[in-house]
Amino acid sequence: MYKLNNEFEINYNKEIIPKKLNPDLDKKLEKEVNFFLKWGYLIIDKALKDNQIILLRKTFNKTFKKLKGKDHIDYNLFEYDKNFLFLLDNKPVIKRISAILGNCIQLHSASARLSSPGSKNQKWHRDGHWPVDPNGTPIGSIPGQINCGYYLDPLTEKNGPIAIVPGSQKALFKPPKKDFEFPDQKIIYAKPGQAIIFNGWIYHRGLGNKSKSNRRVCLICYQNSWMKSRETFDGPIISKIKKSGSSLQKLLLGSVNKW
C-alpha cells in the first residue's frame, strides 16, 4: 500500500527567487520588447566578443570531432564542455530574455547543430507543442519559450540562412510541414557575434547548406521557471554550478523544482 508522506520540504534556497516579476525597462529596451512581441524575433548585435567567438568555434569543433559523424546535440550542451557555459547567462541576451519573459526564467534547452555541405532545407515548424492564443488565458498565462541562436559562421545564400514568418507566433494553427516559401517570409543572414532570439512558436526553418563548409550554431533556449524543461539538470558540470553558482545561474538551471 502506498504510504502518504505529509511532510513538504523545500530543497533550495528561496533567496534565488526574484523579488520582482518584471524588470524596469529603459526606452530602448521597451522598444525592443514591443518589436519582439509584434514580430516574434529580435537581432541582438554585439552579443559575443571576438575572443568568445574564437573560443566557441574551437570548442564546437572539438566537441563534434569527438561525436564522430553526429550532426546535432539536442540537450545538455553544457555537459560536453565547460567552455559553453558562459552562454547560459550571457548578459546581452539575458537582459532581453528577462525583459520579455520576466525575471523568473529557466533554461529550456542548450543544444548545438552542425549543418554539413549538402544538408537540405528544413520543413517549416514550431518548436513549441502547446496550443496558441495571442490573448493568452483569462489569468494572463501563455506558454513562453524564446530561442537564442549564436551562429558561428556568417550566414549566406549558399550555406543556408534562417527563414522566419514575422508575426506567425500568433497564428492559431501550425505551419504545414513542407518545403516552400511563404510570400511574407523573412530571410535572416546572421553574423558571428550576433544573437538571434525568436519566439518558439514562430514559423521558422533553416535553409539547406549548398556551400563547401559547415554551418555551426549553438542554440540556448529559455522559458518561464514554472514550465517543464528539456534539460535534465543533473550532469556533473551543471550540478556543480547549481551548488556554487550565482542566484541567476541556479534559477536558470532549474533549482526551483517545486513550490
Residue ranges and their predicted role:
Residues M1-W39, I43-G136:
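Non-heme Fe(II)-dependent double-stranded beta-helix
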Residues Y2-L21, A195, I202, L207-W259:
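Non-heme Fe(II)/2-oxoglutarate
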Residues F36, E79, I100, L107, ...:
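A generic fold-level signal
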Residues D81-F84, P183-D184, R205-L207:
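Active-site rim elements
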Residues S109-A112, C148-Y150, C218-Y222:
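A structural signal for short, well-ordered beta-strand segments
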Residues S119-A190, M227-D234:
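Catalytic core of non-heme Fe(II) oxygenases with the double-stranded beta-helix
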Residues L155, W201-I202:
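Short Ser/Thr-interspersed hydrophobic loop/turn segments at strand-loop and sheet-helix junctions
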Residues K186-W201:
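Short, conserved beta-strand/loop elements in beta-sheet-dominated catalytic cores
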